[in-house]
């Protein structure tokens, strides 16, 4: 079977998810279907997305055929039959969730011939620029659908941890609120929700904590440098799609409860309630969801309370609220407009602080210690509001158009920090906040070229405008010291980073062409132009001076022309080999320069050139026998300048030449009867950097993780019951230079985690799940904790011990 990346993603996703999720009767039960009239291939893709079944079809069967609008409640097979009416095609069921489309009168086996490429229906984001129904993709990616993601959540405490365990090439999560140090192929990730970027220029490293996983319909992680959406994806893209509007009126109620098993009690209890409604009335469709979640205390393998994370923060003892809605209008059979609004608010209210006395002991010798009695009015918080207006036209002068306008209002507050030894922060005990307001728009068009249907131009543009500032509260140091780090008496407010205004505009064009069933190619260009400006301000480094000197405001401009080219060769059905070159783009972190500014700072002379990466990749994906799918990727990325790196809380800012190379491999196996399945992945990479005046040296552990191995075994004895045992291993590594410990450079130990998830479909409308995280109660420190973000034991946080999660879902 031949399957380009978009097809392989679905095939792999469904192969694995047949092991991951109880899809007991998806081929037999009726599902809500709401499909506009569209080209046949697009209609099949959309049906696959709405019904989560596997559809196999020859690529040339969809050419020149259109499908009628389909709306109502159907089994997937009934919906496919309606789409294929009067098309000369028919659907054949291979099993209850796999269907084959063939010419009328032809046997399903006619697909498996040397000359006919076979595809699997693509689960596509409407305005996606990275997927194509024409050419095979020249990069690796992983897709997690809603049911699969919700199951994996049973064995992980956050979206960041779910992805760390499931995605090759991704570093481990911190087990806290931050994804600082959680890289993708050693570089930064662009995180988007329904096409809206969550990254800001002064990145707070809380992007994956800005959305509740219960609201997610689909996550696609695309690995490798990309500029297709603009800045931020030097390591790859995490594209999140929220629950959809439309279809037959329906509702879903979810309840869950979580408890640590190493210390039973009310402090550790957590839980979530989530309600989702969706449906349609005539040409109008809607979705509405709301929910609340409580996160309790976290306990290590010995039953000790895990201390707060003092550098980047955490959400222990927090309450989270979310509410959102979508309202769509089908203007006609080709046009649709949708307005989506969502609000997410996570607020901490804890009685515990971290004990500052452990910082006096040798680094890494003792764990961080939680002490009770915290007196702090305003604690860690994330507040995120999104407004998103989308318009789609399936036929505008022969092109397909997707347009988007969005607004984002973002606020976050960090943990207080004793910065009296940090001159660039004014020598205070303080607490930082960040305010960001973002406006933006995107335009994407897909234009067929020629009459053969073998060439397509994807083109468009983007605009993004951001305003961010970082105030900080100052606390009385004498009160802080006298209380042992428990009492924070606010004495004033200062400016850490002044209002920073950035604007970016970009245009791109991507040409895609399929030569025949063996060869396809795509390539393109993107031009990006950006500005950043700020007004005069007094930096914190001058706050204690007798005559403070202001830094003069200024403006900086930068641009970049980026290219990509890839080719895919399919020597035989079921095998693909690809080679690609792509460039990524990262706007310079102007904010980190401003907040660490000293007297005489000149924006024109600072390290503000953008990061431009070159990514080279060779890869393979294919079948290994009739029941196994495999992938392999070799990658090499370079950049003349890396990100602005801040060491010792901004006392040292540096940029270096960088090169990162590595390999990823994965395999998934499913038995003929779909009762047993197994799989795993391996990721190895090495990063080297060359500071000015020095030779090449290994990069820090916050950039390049050690060897990572994952494995799972799935057992599904009945259609209703599925069980998954999964393991994740990170190897030991010495990140020190010449045996000397420094920021991000410590000797780290290996660790293995094992999780167990079991699901049972009680009825067509009811499902229960049980998950056990850290099944064997392993006592370990995640990579983030071993690297000591604060350079002392206050950041030496053990991982949670065994945690039990139980959930129940009812569909109305």
What do the PLM-derived regions correspond to, one by one?
Residues 99-102, 126, 160-197, 217:
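Extracytoplasmic beta-strand/coil segments of soluble accessory domains associated
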Residues 254, 517, 530, 626-645, ...:
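Gram-negative outer-membrane beta-barrel transporters
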Residues 390-392, 400-418, 568-570, 576-588, ...:
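Membrane-embedded beta-barrel scaffold of Gram-negative outer-membrane proteins
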Residues 265-300, 304-351, 383-394, 451, ...:
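Transmembrane beta-barrel wall of Gram-negative outer-membrane proteins
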Residues 635, 729-736, 759-812:
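C-terminal beta-signal and adjacent terminal beta-strands/loops
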Residues 330-344, 380-541, 568-570, 629-634, ...:
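Face-selective signature of the C-terminal outer-membrane beta-barrel domain
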Residues 181, 196-223, 275, 647:
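Short acidic/polar hinge/loop motifs at secondary-structure boundaries
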């Amino acid at each position: 079977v031949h399957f380009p990346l978009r097809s392989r993603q679905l095939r792999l996703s469904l192969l694995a998810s047949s092991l991951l999720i109880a899809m007991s009767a998806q081929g037999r039960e009726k599902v809500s279907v709401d499909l506009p009239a569209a080209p046949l291939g697009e209609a099949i893709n959309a049906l696959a997305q709405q019904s989560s079944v596997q559809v196999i079809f020859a690529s040339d069967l969809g050419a020149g055929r259109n499908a009628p609008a389909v709306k109502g409640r159907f089994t997937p097979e009934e919906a496919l039959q309606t789409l294929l009416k009067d098309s000369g095609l028919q659907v054949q069921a291979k099993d209850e969730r796999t269907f084959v489309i063939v010419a009328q009168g032809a046997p399903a086996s006619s697909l498996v011939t040397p000359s006919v490429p076979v595809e699997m229906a693509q689960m596509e984001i409407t305005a996606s620029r990275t997927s194509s129904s024409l050419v095979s993709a020249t990069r690796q990616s992983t897709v997690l659908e809603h049911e699969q993601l919700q199951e994996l959540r049973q064995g992980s405490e956050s979206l960041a941890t779910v992805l760390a365990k499931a995605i090759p090439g991704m570093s481990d999560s911190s087990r806290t609120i931050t994804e600082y140090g959680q890289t993708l192929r050693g570089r930064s990730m662009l995180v988007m929700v329904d096409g809206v970027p969550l990254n800001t220029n002064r990145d707070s490293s809380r992007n994956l904590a800005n959305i509740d996983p219960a609201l997610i319909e689909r996550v696609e992680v695309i690995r490798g440098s990309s500029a297709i959406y603009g800045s931020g994806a030097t390591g790859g893209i995490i594209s999140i799609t929220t629950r959809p509007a439309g279809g037959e009126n329906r509702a879903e109620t979810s309840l869950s409860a979580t408890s640590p098993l190493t210390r039973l009690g009310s402090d550790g209890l957590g839980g979530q309630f989530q309600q989702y409604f969706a449906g349609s009335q005539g040409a109008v469709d809607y979705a509405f969801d709301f929910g609340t979640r409580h996160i309790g205390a976290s306990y290590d393998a010995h039953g000790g309370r895990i201390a707060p994370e003092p550098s980047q923060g955490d959400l222990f003892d927090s309450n989270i609220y979310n509410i959102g809605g979508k309202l769509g209008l089908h203007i006609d059979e080709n046009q649709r407009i949708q307005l989506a609004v969502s609000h997410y608010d996570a607020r901490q209210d804890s009685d515990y602080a971290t004990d500052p006395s452990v910082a006096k002991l040798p680094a890494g010798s003792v764990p961080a210690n939680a002490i009770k009695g915290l007196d702090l009015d305003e604690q860690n918080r994330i507040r995120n509001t999104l407004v998103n207006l989308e318009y789609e036209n399936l036929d505008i002068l022969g092109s397909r158009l997707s347009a988007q306008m969005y607004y984002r209002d973002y606020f976050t507050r960090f943990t207080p920090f004793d910065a009296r030894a940090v001159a660039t922060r004014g020598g205070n005990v303080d607490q930082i906040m960040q305010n960001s307001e973002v406006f933006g728009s995107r335009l994407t068009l897909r234009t067929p070229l020629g009459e053969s249907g073998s060439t397509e131009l994807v083109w468009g543009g983007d605009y993004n405008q951001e305003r961010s500032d970082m105030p900080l509260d100052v606390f009385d140091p004498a009160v802080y010291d006298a209380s042992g780090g428990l009492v924070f008496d606010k004495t004033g407010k200062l400016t850490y980073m002044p209002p920073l205004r950035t604007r970016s505009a970009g245009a791109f064009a991507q040409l895609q062409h399929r030569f025949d069933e063996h060869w396809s190619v795509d390539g393109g260009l993107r031009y990006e132009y950006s500005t950043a400006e700020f007004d005069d301000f007094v930096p914190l480094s001058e706050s204690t001076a007798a005559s403070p000197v202001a830094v003069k405001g200024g403006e900086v401009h930068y641009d970049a022309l980026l290219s990509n080219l890839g080719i895919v060769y399919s020597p035989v059905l079921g095998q693909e080999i690809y080679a690609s070159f792509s460039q990524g783009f990262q706007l310079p972190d102007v904010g980190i320069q401003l907040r660490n500014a000293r007297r005489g700072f000149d924006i024109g002379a600072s390290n503000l050139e953008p990061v431009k990466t070159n990514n080279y990749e060779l890869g393979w994906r294919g079948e290994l026998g009739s029941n196994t799918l495999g992938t392999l990727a070799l990658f090499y990325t370079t950049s003349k300048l890396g990100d602005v790196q801040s060491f010792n809380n901004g006392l040292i800012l540096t940029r270096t030449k960088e090169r990162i190379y590595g390999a990823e491999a994965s395999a998934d196996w499913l038995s003929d009867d779909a009762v047993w399945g197994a799989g795993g992945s391996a990721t190895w990479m090495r990063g080297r950097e060359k500071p000015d005046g020095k030779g090449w040296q290994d990069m820090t552990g916050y950039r390049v993780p050690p060897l990572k191995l994952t494995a799972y075994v799935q057992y599904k004895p009945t259609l209703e019951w599925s069980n998954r045992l999964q393991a994740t291993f990170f190897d030991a590594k010495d990140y020190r230079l010449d045996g000397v410990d420094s920021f991000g450079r410590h000797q780290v130990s290996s660790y293995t985690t094992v999780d167990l998830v079991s699901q049972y479909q009680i009825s067509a409308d009811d499902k229960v799940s049980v998950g056990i995280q850290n099944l064997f109660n392993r006592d370990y420190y995640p990579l983030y904790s071993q690297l000591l973000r604060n350079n002392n034991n206050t950041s030496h946080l053990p991982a949670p011990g065994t945690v039990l999660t139980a959930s129940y879902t009812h569909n109305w």
